[in-house]
């Protein structure tokens, strides 16, 4: 019979339920929090749809807006969603190219969780008539997840989208 989490399992979760939040406008990977995956014997995806991502162009300082999709197959740890929200918010004044932001996010989440598999896909709104949609992924080396990452990378965008995909 399934039961809820015990208090000692939640002691490292400090942001969820906390009404006294600090919204950092500068990149803060240390705000990320994790909790234990209680279903380690099962492969399953966790997907976050993050439609309000903002960062800055490193050259012009102009804001860039995106929807970010983060999908992962957890191992031992999972990312806590409120900490992820605050972490993504911390990119608000971070100046970097779209591709860099997606790789930074993926690397920080790998460091936090050590997932079996993870992918991060940014769908940025057009600037100058061009939208940029960087996709990055990772599968644990020497495992089926590494092969999965290779396959998904090669096939991630087989169906080109229409211009009205935003």
Swiss-Prot record:
HAMAP family: QueF_type1. It is found in: Cytoplasm. Pfam families: QueF. Its EC number is 1.7.1.13. It catalyses: 7-aminomethyl-7-carbaguanine + 2 NADP(+) = 7-cyano-7-deazaguanine + 2 NADPH + 3 H(+). Keywords: Cytoplasm, NADP, Oxidoreductase, Queuosine biosynthesis. Pathway: tRNA modification; tRNA-queuosine biosynthesis. This is NADPH-dependent 7-cyano-7-deazaguanine reductase. One of its GO terms (biological process) is queuosine biosynthetic process. One of its GO terms (molecular function) is preQ1 synthase activity. InterPro entries: GTP-CH-I_C/QueF, NADPH_dep_7-cyano-7-deazaG_red, QueF, QueF_type1. Belongs to the GTP cyclohydrolase I family. QueF type 1 subfamily. One of its GO terms (cellular component) is cytoplasm. Its main location: cytoplasm. Catalyzes the NADPH-dependent reduction of 7-cyano-7-deazaguanine (preQ0) to 7-aminomethyl-7-deazaguanine (preQ1). Substrate binds at residues 79-81, 98-99. The active site is at 57 (thioimide intermediate), 64 (proton donor).
């Amino acid at each position: 019979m399934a039961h809820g989490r015990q208090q000692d399992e939640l002691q490292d979760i400090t942001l969820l339920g906390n009404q006294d939040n600090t919204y950092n406008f500068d990149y803060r990977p240390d705000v990320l929090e994790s909790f234990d995956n209680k279903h380690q014997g099962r492969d399953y995806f966790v997907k976050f749809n993050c439609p309000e991502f903002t960062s800055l162009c490193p050259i012009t300082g102009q804001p860039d807006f995106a929807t970010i999709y983060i999908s992962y197959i957890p191992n031992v740890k999972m990312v806590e969603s409120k900490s992820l929200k605050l972490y993504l918010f911390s990119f608000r004044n971070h100046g970097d190219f779209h591709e860099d932001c997606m790789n930074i996010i993926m690397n920080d989440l790998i460091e936090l969780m050590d997932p079996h598999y993870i992918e991060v896909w940014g769908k940025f709104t057009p600037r100058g008539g061009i939208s940029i949609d960087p996709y990055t992924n990772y599968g644990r080396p020497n495992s089926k997840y590494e092969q999965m990452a290779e396959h998904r990378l090669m096939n991630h965008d087989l169906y080109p989208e229409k211009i009205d995909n935003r």
